[in-house]
Amino acid sequence: MFFHIVLERNMQLHPRFFGRNLKENLVSKLMKDVEGTCSGRHGFVVAITGIDTIGKGLIRDGTGFVTFPVKYQCVVFRPFKGEILEAVVTLVNKMGFFAEAGPVQIFVSKHLIPDDMEFQAGDMPNYTTSDGSVKIQKECEVRLKIIGTRVDATAIFCVGTIKDDFLGVINDPAAA
């Protein structure tokens, strides 16, 4: 799910960036350092939407660098247990399949795939229904439900299921 939150960060800036464009240099360094990163507590930072305050700089002894406390607004993505997501399948094997929803990788075990789907090995491994009408393979889009998350310092991993109503393949590029 997406959230709009306020975060704080201490930014160190080299003396060569001081001058008329100090604020612009500080904001561009903040965007470069923060956007696209993951903190286990807040999730993935998608975009910085605004700068609330830039505090007074503190000169670091011996280096000349200055540390500025910056308070900024940003959009973060953090998946939760029970959330329904649409994802793209990236890998299929006999244990299940992996899918990606934005920066989050989700594993769906073969035990969390409907019982009527069987694994088919070959050059394009997939899970296929007995009548062949539905096929889960690489690059197809699936709707799944998050049933568990594991949060590390720099990544979020999820376990999902498609063994529920209205879940499963929503778009198969191979069928088109």
Swiss-Prot record:
> Its family?
Belongs to the eukaryotic RPB7/RPC8 RNA polymerase subunit family.
Q: What is this protein called?
A: DNA-directed RNA polymerase II subunit 7
Q: What task does this protein carry out?
A: DNA-dependent RNA polymerase catalyzes the transcription of DNA into RNA using the four ribonucleoside triphosphates as substrates. Component of RNA polymerase II which synthesizes mRNA precursors and many functional non-coding RNAs. Pol II is the central component of the basal RNA polymerase II transcription machinery. It is composed of mobile elements that move relative to each other. NRPB7 is part of a subcomplex with NRPB4 that binds to a pocket formed by NRPB1, NRPB2 and NRPB6 at the base of the clamp element.
CC annotations in GO: RNA polymerase II, core complex
One Gene Ontology term of the molecular function aspect = nucleic acid binding
Q: Where is the signal peptide?
A: none
Name one process (GO BP) from the record: DNA-templated transcription initiation
- Classification via Gene3D superfamilies: Nucleic acid-binding proteins, RNA polymerase Rpb7-like, N-terminal domain
Q: Which organism is it from?
A: Arabidopsis thaliana (Mouse-ear cress)
Broad class of where this protein is predominantly found: nucleus
Q: Does the keyword tRNA processing apply?
A: no
On the tree of life, the source organism's domain of life is Eukaryota
Tell me the compartments it is located in: Nucleus
- Give UniProt keywords alphabetically: DNA-directed RNA polymerase, Nucleus, Transcription
Q: Could you tell me which Pfam families the record lists for this protein?
A: S1, SHS2_Rpb7-N
What InterPro entries does the record point to? NA-bd_OB-fold, RNA_pol_Rpb7-like_N_sf, Rpb7-like, Rpb7-like_N, S1_domain
Instruction: State the oligomer form and interacting partners.
Output: Component of the RNA polymerase II complex consisting of at least 12 subunits. Interacts with NRPB4.
